[in-house]
Structures are given as C-alpha cells and as structure tokens.
Curated annotation (Swiss-Prot):
Glycosylation site residues: 125, 221, 514, 581
Upper classification of the organism: Eukaryota, Metazoa, Chordata, Craniata, Vertebrata
Active site residues per record: 502 (charge relay system), 557 (charge relay system), 654 (charge relay system)
Protein name per the record: Complement C1r subcomponent
Record domain Sushi: where: 307-373, 374-449
Location(s) in or outside the cell: Secreted; Cell surface
EC code: 3.4.21.41
Signal sequence, renumbered to the chain: 1-17
Gene3D superfamilies xrefs: Complement Module, domain 1, Laminin, Spermadhesin, CUB domain, Trypsin-like serine proteases
One Gene Ontology cellular component: blood microparticle
BP GO terms, sorted: complement activation, classical pathway; innate immune response; zymogen activation
Notes concerning its domains: The CUB domain 2 shows a compact folded structure in the presence of Ca(2+), whereas it has a flexible, disordered conformation in the absence of Ca(2+). Ca(2+) could provide a switch between the folded and disordered forms; low Ca(2+) could provide flexibility to promote autoprocessing and activation of CIR.
Chain positions with (3R)-3-hydroxyasparagine modification: 167
One Pfam short name: Trypsin
Length: 705
C-alpha cells in the first residue's frame, strides 16, 4: 500500500504546484500531517495516475475540513477529464460545508486531480479549531473503451472502431464484419473478399452487408472446396438483387459461377437464379461491383451430395457382376466374374480377377471387361500315339473333348486296374482352361510298347547252321552289335537292349570301359542296318555277378544297354517279352535263336535263325564232363540243342536271345541269352536263364523311367 503524504514547507507558508504519484493500480491520499491537523495557508494538487486502459476510482475514508458556505475557506477539489467533480469541506453531519461521504468518484481516463486548499486560519468565534484533514483510497478500475467511444462529447475521445469494439481488462481491440479487413490503424475496416474459402460440407454465402446494400468497387472471390467424391448444389435465397440494365446483360455488377474452372452461369437483376447442380467439388463465385448502386445483393445455401457412378453394364451375356447394387457412389466398387468356362479379358490381357472403383468424378476407374470362353490350347502330342476330337474338329475351348489313342498294334495305353483304355484317353477342356482326364488329371496317358507280338512271326523250322534267312518281321526284336566284334541282343521296351555281359567285357580281354558301342536295329540285312544308323548308348548296366577274369565261369552273363533315345516301334522293330514262370524251361520246349553270326565258317550278311529244344540239364552236365571241361553250369543257366543235331548258335550270335512262343498269350518271350558253348554245332549251347534275372532287369529299367 502506497501512503502518499502532502509534504508541507517548514514554515507552513502557502505552497503551490502539483505532486505526482507513481503509476500504480491502487494507493491512498491524505492531507499533510494526517491524522494531525493540517497546516494553514496551504495549497497543492495531487496527480493520481493509473495504467492506460483503466479509470481512477476514489473514495474518502475520513474527511474533516473547516466547514464554510460554498467551501470558500478550506476545501478539497476533485477533477478529471478536464471536468470538476466537486468541491468538498466540513464533516459528516456539519450544518455547513459539503462533505463527500462515501461517494465514489470515477474518472473516464486514467488520471484524477485532487487539489487541497487551506486559508490563513481555522477559527470559529475566536476559538482556534483543529481539523484532521482527510484520508482517501484510490484504485484502478477497468475502462470500457467500447462504451465510452459511443459518447463523442469529449474533446479528445479515443479513436473509434469502425465496425466492432471488444473490451478487455486494461484495453480494447477492434474487428471487422465478415468480408472486411482491419487496416493498419487497427480501427478502420475495408471490404476484403478476394479469397474467401469455405470447406464445410454445407453452409451459407452472401454478399457483404446482405440484405443491406453491398459496398461499391468489390472484387470478391468465394471458393468452395469440399472433399473429393462430393458434388456441390447451390440454392439462391430471396431476396436476390444485383444492379442490372434493361438492354445490356449485367453491365454494372455481376455474379459469375465457375465449377472445375468452367463458367456455368453469370447472374444479375432481381430474378433468383435456378438451383445449380455443379457436378463438382470445387466451385468459385466471383462478384464484381462498380462504384455506384444500391442493391441488396444475394444469399445462397450450398449443400453436398456423394457423387454417383453409372450403373455397370456388361458387354456380353457371360459376364457376371457380383452382388449388383441399385446404386453406386464414390468409393463403392463392383467385382466382375465370368460364367464357368469363361475368362476375363481386358484389352488383350487375361485377368484373374476384376474390380472397378467409383472415382470422385463419377466415372469407374477402369472399363468393363469382357468374358471370353476358356481356350485350353492345342492338346499335347502323345508320344507313340495321337488324339482325335470327339467334339467339333479343331475347337479347343471349354467342354471340348478329345480321345487319345496309341498306335496299334505296336503300342498300348497304360491303364489302371479296373479301367478301360477308352476311359483313360478321354480328356475334356475344363473351366480352368486345362485339358483333364477324370482319373489322370492333367497328365496325358502313356503309350507302352507291346512286346512279343511280331506282325510276321517265324513259320520256318530251319536252323542257323543249315537253315535259311529270316524274313523281315520274323524277329523284330533282333539287335546287331559291334563292340568287340559281332554280337546280338534283343529289344526290351522302346529304349533298352538285353544282351550278354561277355559281349561288352569278353573273357579273353582285359576290362575296358571306353570301347565303342555300336548298336543297330530294324532290319535283317547288315548293310541295311548300317544305313539305318547307329543308336547311341546312354548307359551300360552289367550284372554284378559277372566276372570277366574267370574264363570258365559265365555266371551273371547278362547286361542292359539304355539307348540315348527311344526308338519308334513298327513291323520291323518290336520288343520281346520277359518270362514270368518256369514252364518256359520245360524239357523239349522248342525255341528260336537268331543272329548275324558265323554260318558254315562264313560271316553272315543276313539274319538267320535256328529252332532248338530245351535240353536236360543233367545230360548237359554229363556231356560237359565227358569233354573234360571245368566250365560252371549253374542254376542261372540252361542248355538247349543236342549232340546229334548239326545246328547251334555260333560266334557272332552271342547276346542274342532264346525266343519261345507262349501258346496261352501268343506272345514271344526271351527265356535265355546266348552265353557260351564248345565250338559251333558240336553239341549243346548254354544260355543265361533270364527268368532268374527279371527282378534285376525291372529294377534297372525302372530307375530310368
């Protein structure tokens, strides 16, 4: 609390001037020497100041001055804002004077003057009186400039706000009506509507001062920008009034409307424009006025609606729109598929799926595709077979059917147990665009070689030595080899050669792995065989029991040659079958041995054959011992022929097979392989018993299938 004293000169002589009080928000003012009697013949003015934006409020707490008529002798005078607020003296209850009591004195500005005046004495009827003086408190009170500026009677009023005034404790500020801009003086306003932006989904827009007359010289731009996918609708309200001319369209003032940068209307006059569907989320309203006019302007309400896309329509009867909706709007989508057996096509590209999305401009983001019938393409070629259409020839589309078949009688279709060849070969073009069989799926059938069925089986009974030439097709499995000299073999399947191991690794030679392997098939004449060409070998497999270094032991004399490429079977090239039971080795059973070996001590140029009986093993064993031979004759061998016969296999026939016709199946079986003997036409011949090696043969062949 500031205690402010009016200082008195030492001699209490009359004093003049003013005493400023430091600017504070509150304080007190007293007479000199208060509460002791104040001096005579004294006058001074106390200047009370509070911060700008506040008023001064003064209240006397104690007041005791010499009373007089009209407060002529001693008095306190209060003034503010260049006006007197009164002259006061006396005490509360005195018959003379004018005490202030508890009255509140208020300035309009931030200053108040308190003048204290005393005369030369304080006597009453010759008696000296003592008066205490006064004690007053002041405080800063908020000044409502906005209220005071409406009272323009002051000589120096505050600058007025042109439009709106806003008071706050200690000050005020000005603002402008919509469409106007506060100027640098912070009080005056100027019309400004060149860049008004509206982003709400709905609202009202009007000219300045609507419905009062709009200001002159306006260049207004009202922009409405809403979210993508919304379209704006404009509805003008009454009254609508823009200066016009009867003969010239909108020469003075005009309202122009643009949607997406395109002018969709220019309006003036008193006729309200029609409701506008802009089909856009961006609209600009340009309002221009000249320097004169007294029209009320315009007012509109804008609303938004989600933009809609046209109903999707298919291009053909095979396209399906899933869950078709009655209406599609922004961000909605539809999925198109095809009926079974058809596929989506966009341009020339095949689609696995199709989705179209409604865009913010009311269009679909991609065009409707079409559906094209699934095409399975050309059926795969069947090796050693072919196919025929059971539906329209050459048509490979959905539901087309083909029948695969094998080239008979040389091949037959591989079938599952209990199924027919006709079922195995039927393939249908499926809805997935793939040729399929009900049992095998996508995998095409397999044509297997037919074994042991020559189209021209042998009928003659002549023998190799003393016999005649074989005819084409008599022994279509016959193989001519030239490895370490002439040899033979038999075709198994369409890429395997069955032969004797000793033709690859002769007993009288050291083991060789780099010998040339020349193999010929498909003819009965050596020269013609050479013309047909050699068949490259992919792999050689010799039975592990074969021992090249044991000259008198032909145990395991069996080998397989895998051709690099499968051969194409025909009347002169067919495989022979493998045995499956012991009856093929019954005593006396007749078999045929064919070959390109020595004939009457001459090399044969044509294939020849001999018919021999299966001999008694004991007789063969006895015959061998009579020759003082130590050759091994095991259970994996059998013998054929007879010492009394002058026919036998000879050099160059090794590796060929002992072929027997199975009367039950009418198929030819390779029961033995020409292995060893003593000379030519000098007794029995010895053969590898193929039945004992069938498991090994099948295992070797299956490893490569």
């Amino acid at each position: 609390m500031w205690l402010l004293y009016l200082l008195v000169p030492a001699m209490f002589c009359r004093a003049g001037g003013s005493i400023p009080i430091p600017q504070k928000l509150f304080g007190e003012v007293t007479s000199p020497l208060f509460p002791k009697p104040y001096p005579n013949n004294f006058e001074t003015t106390t200047v009370i100041t509070v911060p700008t934006g506040y008023r001064v409020k003064l209240v006397f707490q104690q007041f005791d001055l010499e009373p007089s008529e009209g407060c002529f002798y001693d008095y306190v005078k209060i003034s503010a804002d260049k006006k007197s607020l009164g002259r006061f003296c006396g005490q509360l209850g005195s018959p003379l004077g004018n005490p202030p009591g508890k009255k509140e004195f208020m300035s309009q500005g931030n200053k108040m003057l308190l003048t204290f005046h005393t005369d030369f004495s304080n006597e009453e009827n010759g008696t000296i009186m003592f008066y205490k003086g006064f004690l007053a408190y002041y405080q800063a009170v908020d000044l409502d400039e906005c209220a005071s500026q409406s009272k323009s009677g002051e000589e120096d009023p505050q600058p007025q706000c042109q439009h709106l005034c806003h008071n706050y404790v200690g000050g005020y500020f000005c603002s402008c009506l919509p469409g106007y801009e506060l100027q640098k003086d912070r009080h005056s306003c100027q019309a400004e509507c060149s860049s008004e932006l509206y982003t709400e989904a709905s609202g009202y827009i009007s000219s300045l001062e609507y419905p009062r007359s709009y200001p002159p010289d306006l260049r207004c731009n009202y922009s409405i920008r809403v979210e993508r996918g919304l379209t704006l609708h404009l509805k003008f309200l009454e009254p609508f009034e823009i200066d016009d001319h009867q003969q010239v369209h909108c020469p003075y003032d005009q309202l122009q409307i643009y949607a997406n940068g395109k002018n969709i209307g220019e309006f003036c006059g008193k006729q309200r424009p029609p409701d506008l569907d802009t089909s856009s989320n961006a609209v600009d309203l340009l309002f221009f006025t000249d320097e004169s006019g007294d029209s009320r302007g315009w007012n509109l309400r804008y609303t938004t609606e989600i933009i809609k896309c046209p109903q999707p329509k298919t291009l053909d009867e095979f396209t399906i729109i899933q869950n078709l909706q009655p209406q599609y709007q922004f961000r909605d989508y539809f999925i198109a598929t095809c009926k079974q057996g058809y596929q989506l096509i966009e341009g020339n590209q095949v689609l696995h799926s199709f989705t179209a999305v409604c865009q913010d401009d009311g269009t679909w983001h991609r065009a409707m595709p079409r559906c094209k019938i699934k095409d399975c393409g050309q059926p795969r070629n069947l090796p050693n077979g072919a196919f025929r259409y059971t539906t329209t020839m050459g048509v490979n589309t959905y539901k087309a059917r083909i029948q695969y078949y094998c080239h008979k009688p040389y091949y037959k279709m591989q079938t599952r147990a209990g199924s027919r060849e006709s079922e195995q070969g039927v393939y249908t073009c499926t809805a997935q665009g793939i040729w399929k069989n009900e049992q095998k799926g996508e995998k095409i059938p397999r044509c297997l070689p037919v074994c042991g069925k020559p189209v021209n089986p042998v009928e003659q009974r002549q023998r190799i030595i003393g016999g005649q030439k074989a005819k084409m097709g008599n022994f279509p499995w016959q193989v001519f080899t030239n490895i370490h000299g002439r040899g033979g073999g038999a075709l198994l399947g369409d890429r395997w050669i069955l032969t004797a191991a000793h033709t690859l690794y002769p007993k009288e030679h050291e083991a060789q792995t780099n010998a040339s392997l020349d193999v010929f098939l498909g003819h009965t004449n050596v020269e013609e065989l050479m013309k047909l060409g050699n068949h490259p070998i992919r792999r050689v497999s010799v039975h592990p029991d074969y021992r090249q270094d044991e000259s008198h032991n032909f145990e395991g004399d069996i080998a397989l040659l895998e051709l690099e490429n499968s051969v194409t079977l025909g009347p002169n090239l067919l495989p022979i079958c493998l045995p499956d039971n012991e009856t093929f080795y019954d005593l006396g059973l007749m078999g045929y041995v064919s070959g390109f070996g020595v004939m009457e001590e001459k090399i044969a140029h044509d294939l020849r054959f001999v018919r021999l009986p299966v001999a008694n093993p004991q007789a063969c064993e006895t015959w061998l011992r009579g020759k003082n031979r130590m050759d091994v004759f095991s259970q994996n061998m059998f013998c054929a022929g007879h010492p009394s016969l002058k026919q036998d296999a000879c050099q160059g026939d090794s590796g060929g097979v002992f072929a027997v016709r199975d009367p039950n199946t009418d198929r030819w079986v390779a029961t033995g392989i020409v292995s060893w003997g003593i000379g030519c036409s000098r007794g029995y011949g010895f053969y590898t018993k193929v039945l004992n090696y069938v498991d090994w043969i099948k295992k070797e062949m299956e490893e490569e299938d």
